[in-house]
Amino acid sequence: MRLLPDETIEVKSPAQLATMREAGLVTAAALRAAVAAIEPGISTAELDAIAEREIRAAGAIPSFLGYHGFPATICASVNDQIVHGIPSPQQVLRAGDLISVDCGAIVDGWHGDAAVTIRVTPDAATAKSGQRALGTREDGEDPEDEVAGLLDACEGALWHGLAQAVPGHRLGDISHAIEQAARAAGPYGIIREYTGHGIGAQMHMDPPVPNFGRAGRGPVLSAGMTLAIEPMLVLGRAETLLLDDDWTVVTADGSWAAHFEHTVAVTEAGPWVLTSEDGGASGFARLLAGGRVTEASPRSLAAGNGQAALAGAIRTTGTASEGARHGI
Protein backbone atom coordinates (compact mmCIF):
# COMPACT_ATOMS: atom_id res chain seq x y z
CA MET A 1 0.00 0.00 0.00
CA ARG A 2 1.17 3.53 -0.72
CA LEU A 3 -0.32 6.99 -0.38
CA LEU A 4 -0.49 9.44 -3.23
CA PRO A 5 1.23 12.74 -2.33
CA ASP A 6 -1.04 15.64 -1.46
CA GLU A 7 -4.19 13.55 -1.63
CA THR A 8 -3.56 10.85 1.04
CA ILE A 9 -5.53 8.32 -1.02
CA GLU A 10 -4.46 4.74 -0.49
CA VAL A 11 -3.26 2.84 -3.53
CA LYS A 12 -3.45 -0.89 -2.88
CA SER A 13 -1.25 -3.63 -4.20
CA PRO A 14 -2.80 -6.54 -6.15
CA ALA A 15 -2.50 -8.73 -3.05
CA GLN A 16 -4.27 -6.13 -0.93
CA LEU A 17 -7.03 -5.80 -3.52
CA ALA A 18 -7.45 -9.57 -3.45
CA THR A 19 -7.99 -9.44 0.30
CA MET A 20 -10.45 -6.58 -0.08
CA ARG A 21 -12.28 -8.72 -2.63
CA GLU A 22 -12.60 -11.42 0.03
CA ALA A 23 -13.99 -8.85 2.47
CA GLY A 24 -16.36 -7.65 -0.24
CA LEU A 25 -17.68 -11.13 -0.91
CA VAL A 26 -18.26 -11.74 2.80
CA THR A 27 -20.12 -8.43 2.98
CA ALA A 28 -22.23 -9.38 -0.02
CA ALA A 29 -23.05 -12.78 1.48
CA ALA A 30 -24.12 -11.20 4.76
CA LEU A 31 -26.37 -8.76 2.92
CA ARG A 32 -27.91 -11.58 0.89
CA ALA A 33 -28.61 -13.58 4.04
CA ALA A 34 -30.25 -10.62 5.77
CA VAL A 35 -32.32 -9.67 2.72
CA ALA A 36 -33.49 -13.26 2.26
CA ALA A 37 -34.92 -13.17 5.78
CA ILE A 38 -36.86 -9.94 5.36
CA GLU A 39 -40.59 -10.40 5.71
CA PRO A 40 -43.40 -8.80 7.66
CA GLY A 41 -43.04 -9.57 11.36
CA ILE A 42 -39.25 -9.89 11.53
CA SER A 43 -37.35 -7.42 13.69
CA THR A 44 -34.29 -5.52 12.58
CA ALA A 45 -32.43 -7.07 15.53
CA GLU A 46 -33.08 -10.50 14.01
CA LEU A 47 -31.67 -9.31 10.69
CA ASP A 48 -28.61 -8.04 12.53
CA ALA A 49 -28.04 -11.44 14.14
CA ILE A 50 -28.32 -13.16 10.76
CA ALA A 51 -25.72 -10.87 9.19
CA GLU A 52 -23.33 -11.26 12.12
CA ARG A 53 -23.56 -15.06 11.98
CA GLU A 54 -22.80 -15.00 8.26
CA ILE A 55 -19.75 -12.78 8.71
CA ARG A 56 -18.30 -14.75 11.61
CA ALA A 57 -18.95 -18.08 9.88
CA ALA A 58 -16.68 -16.85 7.09
CA GLY A 59 -13.92 -16.10 9.60
CA ALA A 60 -14.37 -12.35 9.16
CA ILE A 61 -15.15 -9.53 11.60
CA PRO A 62 -18.14 -7.16 11.42
CA SER A 63 -16.86 -3.71 10.45
CA PHE A 64 -19.62 -1.73 12.11
CA LEU A 65 -19.88 -3.49 15.47
CA GLY A 66 -18.15 -1.25 18.03
CA TYR A 67 -17.13 1.33 15.41
CA HIS A 68 -17.12 4.58 17.41
CA GLY A 69 -19.49 2.77 19.75
CA PHE A 70 -22.01 1.61 17.14
CA PRO A 71 -23.82 -1.32 18.80
CA ALA A 72 -24.64 -3.58 15.86
CA THR A 73 -23.36 -5.42 12.78
CA ILE A 74 -25.71 -3.77 10.31
CA CYS A 75 -27.35 -0.41 9.96
CA ALA A 76 -31.08 -1.01 9.48
CA SER A 77 -32.83 2.18 8.35
CA VAL A 78 -36.60 2.02 7.91
CA ASN A 79 -38.82 4.37 5.88
CA ASP A 80 -37.79 7.95 6.75
CA GLN A 81 -34.50 6.77 8.28
CA ILE A 82 -31.79 7.50 5.72
CA VAL A 83 -28.72 5.83 7.24
CA HIS A 84 -27.25 4.50 10.49
CA GLY A 85 -30.46 3.08 11.94
CA ILE A 86 -29.71 0.90 14.98
CA PRO A 87 -31.27 -2.58 14.83
CA SER A 88 -33.79 -3.20 17.59
CA PRO A 89 -36.12 -6.00 18.75
CA GLN A 90 -38.81 -3.32 18.88
CA GLN A 91 -38.36 -2.37 15.22
CA VAL A 92 -40.64 -4.96 13.62
CA LEU A 93 -41.08 -4.72 9.86
CA ARG A 94 -44.49 -4.42 8.27
CA ALA A 95 -45.63 -5.03 4.71
CA GLY A 96 -44.99 -1.91 2.68
CA ASP A 97 -42.06 -0.69 4.77
CA LEU A 98 -38.86 0.39 3.07
CA ILE A 99 -35.63 -0.84 4.67
CA SER A 100 -32.00 -0.09 3.95
CA VAL A 101 -29.53 -2.70 5.16
CA ASP A 102 -25.92 -1.49 5.31
CA CYS A 103 -23.17 -3.95 6.20
CA GLY A 104 -19.38 -4.21 6.36
CA ALA A 105 -16.85 -6.96 6.98
CA ILE A 106 -13.12 -7.10 7.73
CA VAL A 107 -10.80 -9.80 6.38
CA ASP A 108 -7.17 -9.72 7.50
CA GLY A 109 -7.50 -6.03 8.33
CA TRP A 110 -9.15 -4.95 5.06
CA HIS A 111 -12.73 -3.71 4.75
CA GLY A 112 -15.73 -4.19 2.51
CA ASP A 113 -18.87 -2.02 2.72
CA ALA A 114 -22.20 -2.29 0.88
CA ALA A 115 -25.88 -1.44 1.26
CA VAL A 116 -29.19 -2.22 -0.40
CA THR A 117 -32.73 -0.92 0.05
CA ILE A 118 -35.83 -3.05 -0.50
CA ARG A 119 -39.55 -2.86 0.03
CA VAL A 120 -40.99 -5.26 2.58
CA THR A 121 -43.58 -7.52 0.94
CA PRO A 122 -45.02 -10.91 1.82
CA ASP A 123 -42.26 -12.26 -0.43
CA ALA A 124 -39.72 -9.51 0.18
CA ALA A 125 -36.69 -11.54 -0.87
CA THR A 126 -37.93 -11.50 -4.48
CA ALA A 127 -38.55 -7.75 -4.29
CA LYS A 128 -34.91 -6.87 -3.76
CA SER A 129 -33.10 -4.80 -6.35
CA GLY A 130 -31.04 -6.36 -9.10
CA GLN A 131 -33.73 -8.50 -10.71
CA ARG A 132 -34.55 -6.28 -13.68
CA ALA A 133 -32.96 -3.75 -15.99
CA LEU A 134 -32.30 -0.52 -14.15
CA GLY A 135 -34.81 2.14 -15.07
CA THR A 136 -37.47 -0.34 -16.22
CA ARG A 137 -40.60 -1.71 -14.57
CA GLU A 138 -42.17 -5.13 -14.67
CA ASP A 139 -45.45 -5.75 -16.55
CA GLY A 140 -48.36 -4.62 -14.45
CA GLU A 141 -46.28 -2.53 -12.08
CA ASP A 142 -47.83 0.85 -11.44
CA PRO A 143 -45.66 3.43 -13.27
CA GLU A 144 -46.71 6.00 -10.67
CA ASP A 145 -45.38 3.95 -7.77
CA GLU A 146 -43.10 6.55 -6.24
CA VAL A 147 -41.29 4.10 -3.97
CA ALA A 148 -40.39 1.81 -6.87
CA GLY A 149 -39.20 4.86 -8.76
CA LEU A 150 -37.09 5.96 -5.82
CA LEU A 151 -35.40 2.56 -5.62
CA ASP A 152 -34.72 2.47 -9.35
CA ALA A 153 -33.34 6.01 -9.27
CA CYS A 154 -31.02 5.43 -6.33
CA GLU A 155 -29.63 2.12 -7.56
CA GLY A 156 -29.24 3.49 -11.06
CA ALA A 157 -27.35 6.51 -9.73
CA LEU A 158 -25.01 4.16 -7.87
CA TRP A 159 -24.10 2.25 -11.03
CA HIS A 160 -23.61 5.45 -13.00
CA GLY A 161 -21.13 6.52 -10.33
CA LEU A 162 -19.39 3.15 -10.26
CA ALA A 163 -18.95 3.29 -14.03
CA GLN A 164 -16.77 6.38 -13.65
CA ALA A 165 -14.23 4.61 -11.40
CA VAL A 166 -11.56 4.24 -14.06
CA PRO A 167 -7.95 5.46 -14.21
CA GLY A 168 -7.62 9.00 -15.49
CA HIS A 169 -11.07 10.11 -14.44
CA ARG A 170 -11.44 12.54 -11.56
CA LEU A 171 -13.31 12.01 -8.35
CA GLY A 172 -15.78 14.69 -9.38
CA ASP A 173 -16.75 12.60 -12.39
CA ILE A 174 -18.23 10.02 -10.01
CA SER A 175 -20.11 12.65 -8.01
CA HIS A 176 -21.36 14.35 -11.16
CA ALA A 177 -22.59 11.10 -12.72
CA ILE A 178 -24.54 10.22 -9.57
CA GLU A 179 -26.15 13.65 -9.39
CA GLN A 180 -27.10 13.73 -13.06
CA ALA A 181 -28.57 10.24 -13.01
CA ALA A 182 -30.62 11.07 -9.93
CA ARG A 183 -31.90 14.35 -11.36
CA ALA A 184 -32.78 12.72 -14.67
CA ALA A 185 -34.78 10.04 -12.86
CA GLY A 186 -37.12 12.37 -11.00
CA PRO A 187 -37.52 15.16 -8.45
CA TYR A 188 -35.70 13.33 -5.69
CA GLY A 189 -33.81 14.99 -2.87
CA ILE A 190 -30.09 14.20 -2.96
CA ILE A 191 -28.58 13.91 0.51
CA ARG A 192 -25.54 16.16 0.80
CA GLU A 193 -24.50 15.85 4.45
CA TYR A 194 -23.51 12.19 4.15
CA THR A 195 -21.35 10.83 1.38
CA GLY A 196 -19.30 7.92 0.15
CA HIS A 197 -15.68 7.55 1.20
CA GLY A 198 -12.35 5.96 0.61
CA ILE A 199 -11.97 2.51 2.14
CA GLY A 200 -9.20 0.02 2.76
CA ALA A 201 -7.25 -0.64 5.94
CA GLN A 202 -9.86 1.57 7.62
CA MET A 203 -13.56 1.70 6.89
CA HIS A 204 -13.62 5.47 6.41
CA MET A 205 -10.68 7.12 4.68
CA ASP A 206 -9.98 9.95 2.31
CA PRO A 207 -11.42 10.99 -0.01
CA PRO A 208 -15.05 11.77 0.76
CA VAL A 209 -17.17 10.98 -2.29
CA PRO A 210 -20.13 13.39 -2.52
CA ASN A 211 -23.22 12.41 -4.47
CA PHE A 212 -23.22 15.71 -6.34
CA GLY A 213 -20.65 17.95 -7.98
CA ARG A 214 -18.86 19.01 -11.13
CA ALA A 215 -17.19 16.71 -13.57
CA GLY A 216 -13.46 17.18 -14.06
CA ARG A 217 -12.83 18.26 -10.47
CA GLY A 218 -10.96 16.61 -7.62
CA PRO A 219 -8.16 14.04 -7.45
CA VAL A 220 -7.28 11.99 -10.51
CA LEU A 221 -8.19 8.33 -10.07
CA SER A 222 -5.50 5.72 -10.51
CA ALA A 223 -5.38 1.93 -10.45
CA GLY A 224 -5.38 0.53 -6.92
CA MET A 225 -7.66 3.14 -5.36
CA THR A 226 -10.76 1.82 -3.62
CA LEU A 227 -13.93 3.75 -2.86
CA ALA A 228 -17.26 3.11 -1.17
CA ILE A 229 -19.83 4.85 -3.33
CA GLU A 230 -23.26 5.33 -1.74
CA PRO A 231 -25.99 7.60 -3.08
CA MET A 232 -28.86 8.46 -0.75
CA LEU A 233 -32.07 9.80 -2.28
CA VAL A 234 -35.35 10.85 -0.67
CA LEU A 235 -38.88 11.42 -1.92
CA GLY A 236 -39.02 14.88 -0.36
CA ARG A 237 -36.54 17.54 0.69
CA ALA A 238 -32.91 16.67 1.37
CA GLU A 239 -32.74 18.20 4.86
CA THR A 240 -31.80 15.73 7.60
CA LEU A 241 -32.07 15.36 11.36
CA LEU A 242 -30.00 13.28 13.77
CA LEU A 243 -32.03 11.39 16.37
CA ASP A 244 -31.21 11.38 20.07
CA ASP A 245 -29.33 8.06 19.74
CA ASP A 246 -26.62 10.11 17.94
CA TRP A 247 -26.64 7.64 15.04
CA THR A 248 -29.94 7.44 13.20
CA VAL A 249 -30.30 10.02 10.42
CA VAL A 250 -33.85 10.80 9.28
CA THR A 251 -35.44 13.12 6.77
CA ALA A 252 -36.59 16.39 8.29
CA ASP A 253 -39.92 16.24 6.45
CA GLY A 254 -40.65 12.56 7.13
CA SER A 255 -40.28 11.52 3.50
CA TRP A 256 -38.96 8.05 2.72
CA ALA A 257 -35.37 7.37 1.73
CA ALA A 258 -33.30 4.91 -0.29
CA HIS A 259 -29.60 4.07 0.09
CA PHE A 260 -27.45 1.82 -2.10
CA GLU A 261 -23.71 1.21 -1.78
CA HIS A 262 -20.87 -0.81 -3.26
CA THR A 263 -17.12 -0.90 -2.70
CA VAL A 264 -15.26 -0.51 -5.99
CA ALA A 265 -11.60 -0.81 -6.99
CA VAL A 266 -10.16 1.31 -9.78
CA THR A 267 -8.23 -1.03 -12.10
CA GLU A 268 -6.64 -0.75 -15.52
CA ALA A 269 -9.38 -3.06 -16.82
CA GLY A 270 -12.10 -0.83 -15.43
CA PRO A 271 -14.25 -0.72 -12.29
CA TRP A 272 -14.06 -3.88 -10.17
CA VAL A 273 -17.04 -3.94 -7.82
CA LEU A 274 -15.60 -5.79 -4.85
CA THR A 275 -18.93 -6.25 -3.06
CA SER A 276 -20.71 -7.68 -6.11
CA GLU A 277 -20.55 -11.44 -6.59
CA ASP A 278 -19.73 -11.12 -10.29
CA GLY A 279 -17.51 -8.08 -9.87
CA GLY A 280 -20.17 -5.78 -11.28
CA ALA A 281 -20.81 -7.44 -14.64
CA SER A 282 -24.56 -7.88 -14.16
CA GLY A 283 -24.99 -4.42 -12.67
CA PHE A 284 -23.30 -2.70 -15.59
CA ALA A 285 -25.30 -4.87 -18.00
CA ARG A 286 -28.53 -3.74 -16.33
CA LEU A 287 -27.34 -0.16 -16.48
CA LEU A 288 -26.90 -0.44 -20.23
CA ALA A 289 -30.20 -2.30 -20.65
CA GLY A 290 -32.00 0.46 -18.79
CA GLY A 291 -31.03 2.96 -21.45
CA ARG A 292 -29.69 5.54 -19.02
CA VAL A 293 -26.15 5.60 -20.35
CA THR A 294 -25.85 8.50 -22.78
CA GLU A 295 -22.53 7.40 -24.20
CA ALA A 296 -20.54 4.36 -23.17
CA SER A 297 -18.05 2.06 -24.84
CA PRO A 298 -17.59 -1.17 -22.88
CA ARG A 299 -14.08 -2.46 -23.46
CA SER A 300 -14.03 -5.41 -21.10
CA LEU A 301 -16.25 -7.72 -19.12
CA ALA A 302 -13.60 -10.04 -17.74
CA ALA A 303 -15.86 -12.70 -16.25
CA GLY A 304 -12.90 -14.93 -15.53
CA ASN A 305 -11.51 -12.77 -12.75
CA GLY A 306 -14.72 -11.01 -11.82
CA GLN A 307 -13.61 -7.57 -13.06
CA ALA A 308 -16.25 -5.64 -14.95
CA ALA A 309 -15.20 -2.70 -17.07
CA LEU A 310 -17.54 -0.09 -18.40
CA ALA A 311 -15.06 2.18 -20.13
CA GLY A 312 -15.66 5.37 -22.03
CA ALA A 313 -17.30 8.50 -20.77
CA ILE A 314 -20.86 8.72 -19.54
CA ARG A 315 -21.30 12.31 -20.52
CA THR A 316 -23.64 14.49 -18.53
CA THR A 317 -23.79 18.09 -17.42
CA GLY A 318 -24.87 19.69 -14.20
CA THR A 319 -24.30 22.26 -11.54
CA ALA A 320 -21.56 22.54 -9.00
CA SER A 321 -21.95 21.91 -5.31
CA GLU A 322 -19.81 21.67 -2.25
CA GLY A 323 -18.35 18.67 -0.46
CA ALA A 324 -19.83 16.98 2.56
CA ARG A 325 -18.95 14.69 5.41
CA HIS A 326 -19.06 10.94 5.24
CA GLY A 327 -20.71 8.36 7.44
CA ILE A 328 -21.15 4.59 7.45
Report residues per predicted region.
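Active-site neighborhoods and metal-handling regions in enzymes and metal-associated proteins
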Residues: M1-I328
